[in-house]
Amino acid sequence: MGVVSFAQESESPVAPGRLFKALILDSHNLCPKLMPQSIKSIDIIQGDGGVGTIKQTNFTRGIHIKHRIDEVDNEKCRCKFTLIEGDVMGEKLRSAGYEIEFMDDGEGGSICRMLSEYETVGDVVFRDEDIEEGKEKATELFKPVEAFLLANPDAYA
């Protein structure tokens, strides 16, 4: 068993509050509309969107993941959540935690910082390729939302 952590940062011309609202607070409504080829639905299984809420993302390829929201700070545009079911949970991972923060870049846009921490099962080792694949999945979600917000400047304002 080991713990693997990595940080990822990306810049966006979209303001932090808009990205936070779209990607964190309203992802269950927006993401399936923007990415119907990969996301079938995102259902709120428990809660009201705040701390303790459990969301299930159903992918078009027939698998799902569930995550629990552990912390939400609307003022700081920050969220912490834990993957609790699906994907490689149990098989390769004992736990997976994430912290996402959208910060003002001083020019009207934002810097998105994501910290990921994985606790592996047994002697499973995360390879660099696994980490890169995780970063690519995050980008696949981020870019369509960013494009939508740029094309719709009043959305999530």
What kind of region is each of these model predictions?
Residues 8-10, 65-71, 95-104:
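Hydrophobic/aromatic beta-strand elements that line small-molecule binding cavities or substrate pockets
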Residues 16-17, 47, 70-78, 101-111:
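A short, structured loop/turn motif at beta-sheet edges
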Residues 1-50:
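Hydrophobic ligand-binding cavity/cleft-lining segments
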Residues 3-9, 39, 54, 64, ...:
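Intrinsic-disorder/low-complexity, polar/charged segments enriched in Ser/Thr/Lys/Arg/Asp/Glu/Gln
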Residues 30-33, 40-91, 148, 152:
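Glycine-rich portal/gate segments that line the openings of hydrophobic small-molecule binding cavities
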Residues 19-23, 55, 69, 112-114:
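Hydrophobic pocket/interface hotspot
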Residues 1-2, 103, 132-157:
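C-terminal helix/juxtamembrane-tail motif
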Residues 80-140:
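Beta-strand/loop substructures that line and gate deep hydrophobic ligand-binding cavities in soluble
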